[in-house]
UniProtKB/Swiss-Prot annotation:
More about this protein: Present with 5110 molecules/cell in log phase SD medium.
Protein name: Sugar utilization regulatory protein IMP2
Keyword field: Phosphoprotein
Biased segments, Acidic residues type: 96-132
An annotated GO BP: regulation of transcription by RNA polymerase II
Listed Polar residues bias regions: 1-29
A GO cellular component annotation in the UniProt record: cytoplasm
Known function: Controls the nucleo-mitochondrial dependence of galactose, maltose and raffinose utilization. Becomes essential in the absence of functioning mitochondria.
Record PTM Phosphothreonine, positions in chain: T24
Region (Disordered) location: 1-74, 91-132
Taxonomic superkingdom: Eukaryota
Length: 346
């Protein structure tokens, strides 16, 4: 078949100006035929895409089932190590499923791990779970408060229980002389600082640079942190700095004296509790108002270079949230006693 362009001459005759030879005949394709052909092509592409998606989904489902089985095994192994009181065994956890899959699926596993990052829980979250706590408490055949810290001659529970009657007798003995050794100073900007040095025996040894800083908010958990610090971390001849930050400027000096008195009575009680092990010790009680308590702590750490900064977990979650310093932080948490009621946890 030829395609040509006709040129009409003045005499009325026509001649071929240009012609193109076509090897295949051309056919006219209507709209309905074009639509039908497009549907067939799209159907084939959808079928191929569906097969590919089904393969990927089956692979992801198998991978998710394998990861879920591994997570269940890890949770059971974690609970087993906690109940056997051997947390070091968690360092040897091996993922058997990942070894069986081989090295060929490392890239696919990396993609799958990215999706499971939000679902995974840390060891602390699993141990601190309510169900786990109940199961762990059932397996423990002794009270954690019955432990005896190195500097105490009695258990923690006995130290805490003896505080109220001992402090009551101590307050009677110093009645009328509560503020004798407390120094109160007015600082620039209208800020106030109250300080008292409490010495046991000969005090801190000359040349002994070991010291600790305890940041307290006068709560019961902070008192427990002080008890743990005095019973487990302090050595002979050390110095302990107890820092309390008063958030509001007091209208009179009685508030600052009261803050020092609340800390002093617990320190004196702990002096009596550690008398069988520690003879010489210094404790500096400090209560003050300051615009930037975190900056104050960093300056004290830079100047005193303590062994560690000790505080309660409630302080870490409130006042010292996002706090960073150059020394280790010892966060002490007082686990509250739960009343076991039948039928509630079942």
């Amino acid at each position: 078949m030829q395609k040509s362009i006709l040129l009409t001459k003045p005499d009325g005759t026509q001649s071929n100006l240009h012609s193109i030879k076509t090897e295949t005949p051309t056919t006219v394709e209507f709209d309905s035929e074009q639509m039908e052909r497009g549907h067939r092509e799209r159907g084939r592409s959808k079928k191929k895409r569906g097969e590919r998606d089904s393969n990927v989904s089956s692979l992801s489902r198998s991978r998710s089932r394998a990861s879920s089985r591994s997570r269940v095994r890890e949770e059971e192994f974690l609970k087993w190590t906690v109940l056997r009181q051997d947390p070091s065994m968690r360092l040897r956890v091996v993922d058997v499923d990942s070894e069986e899959e081989g090295e060929g699926n490392d890239e696919d596993d990396d993609d799958g791990d990215g999706d499971d990052m939000d679902e995974e829980e840390s060891d602390e979250e699993q141990v601190s779970d309510i169900e786990n706590d109940l199961e762990i408490d059932e397996e423990f055949h002794y009270d954690l408060g019955m432990k005896v810290l190195p500097n105490f001659c009695t258990s923690i529970n006995e130290v805490l229980d003896s505080s109220k009657p001992w402090i009551a007798k101590y307050e009677i003995s110093i009645r009328g002389h509560e503020n004798e050794d407390v120094s109160l100073e007015q600082l620039d900007g209208g800020y106030v600082r109250a300080m008292q040095l409490l010495t046991k025996g000969a005090g801190a040894e000359a040349g002994n640079q070991r010291s600790f800083i305890l940041y307290t908010d006068l709560s019961s958990e902070s008192t427990y942190a002080l008890t743990y610090l005095m019973g487990a971390a302090v050595n002979q001849g050390d110095t302990v700095y107890i820092v309390h930050w008063e958030p509001s400027k007091p209208t009179d000096d009685s508030q600052m004296f009261a803050n020092v008195a609340r800390i002093r009575k617990h320190v004196m009680h702990l002096f009596d509790c550690v008398a069988g092990v520690l003879d010489d010790l210094d404790v500096v009680v400090l209560s003050l108002t300051h615009p930037y308590p975190k900056h104050l702590l960093n300056e004290m750490i830079h100047g005193l270079k303590p062994v560690a900064l000790c505080c309660s977990l409630s302080v870490i979650l409130s006042t010292l949230q996002n706090f960073v310093c150059s020394v280790p932080i010892l966060a002490v948490r007082k686990k509250l006693k739960r009343a076991k009621r039948k039928g509630i946890s079942e």
